[in-house]
């Protein structure tokens, strides 16, 4: 089944709930970057959170949301992009990180990411300069960190759940997440009731493994609160890189540097950090780029 994000609005329009099955998306990221278990879990959670934030906070097809996470853990930096049309991409600085399981027998994402560092979210909506909100990491588990970001940077009371189940061979069994947001008009009693539902909710990975859909996960979170489901949004890993794009960047290099690539290397090759695609430039390609300086 293809990945998608389900969304719903409470009947009184006091809450929004989003839930995603991102299994295929995270599998594609793992395949492209050859990530090991701890790196897979961290990158997968970041991708799911980015998809949920983009679905809730972007309005136009050209809008872009970028998440940067830099903790003091061994996976290093995490960088992810999301769009309003359900595409995400991203990479982890150190893809080959395995760690012992934590005290509850799960992948130790908090140790992998680190508990000291920053989480930054940049929104580019095509009007004025992009806006960046930044908060310190509070746990490194990422779900709590994104919850804190929404509360402190966007002033939105929220609850976020993120989960990636990695098999022993480093493949991804399931991945997904949810995001509950309070809207203007919500009162503390309503929020407490839904937060209680969230606290008793099993891990999203367990719900997905048991066969629940994103819509059913939303219903579990809503409990007795009636909700109106909105249009579902397909979700996939996709990158907008191209040989032409990287060529445009290379064309800005000094003439002498391009000539050195021709004389010493007989061409050039570049790799996209976000997706791992490689692009080769022949001598003829480089000579064509050099003509842009003339």
UniProtKB/Swiss-Prot annotation:
Under oxidizing conditions two disulfide bonds are formed involving the reactive cysteines. Under reducing conditions zinc is bound to the reactive cysteines and the protein is inactive. Keywords: Chaperone, Cytoplasm, Disulfide bond, Redox-active center, Zinc. It is found in: Cytoplasm. The keyword Transferase does not apply. One of its GO terms (molecular function) is protein folding chaperone. It holds the Pfam family HSP33. InterPro entries: Heat_shock_Hsp33, Heat_shock_Hsp33_C, Heat_shock_Hsp33_N. Disulfide bonds join 239-241, 272-275. It comes from the Bacteria. CDD domains: Hsp33 (cd00498). GO terms for biological process: protein refolding. The keyword Chaperone applies. Its main location: cytoplasm. GO terms for cellular component: cytoplasm. Redox regulated molecular chaperone. Protects both thermally unfolding and oxidatively damaged proteins from irreversible aggregation. Plays an important role in the bacterial defense system toward oxidative stress. HAMAP family: HslO. Belongs to the HSP33 family. This is 33 kDa chaperonin. It comes from Lacticaseibacillus paracasei (strain ATCC 334 / BCRC 17002 / CCUG 31169 / CIP 107868 / KCTC 3260 / NRRL B-441) (Lactobacillus paracasei).
